[in-house]
């Protein structure tokens, strides 16, 4: 047991840190998800949604292993990923509010699967925008945030 602890202490920080999962978004509206971490692997899925959030699970050179909100997984080249924040509404008929409280004015009802861009988050709420609306959603209704 002490040997394991000693070995763990000598692992480089980057190796330990690289095991953390985090979210990025698709940079373009045409992105290939591949079966493995190189251009030689076949394409599994062809994404057509810019800013779609993906969970980064692993890395290999210039490729990142991702999982999307439908549990599809595979590899995407880093040039196709962005740090811009976005999320997917995971429940149906979610109310977009004018402020970060359920007692504020309702602005719109968003359907499951709707892509929203994230402006900022605080506590259990995120300020988001779509093409038509700006407002606040509860974090628990969104996929793409940690």
PLM region spans:
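Classical Sec-dependent N-terminal signal peptides that target proteins to the secretory pathway
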Residues: 1-19
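SH3-family beta-barrel domains
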Residues: 15-35, 45-50, 57-99, 103-124, ...
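Second-shell loop/turn segments in exported
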Residues: 37-41
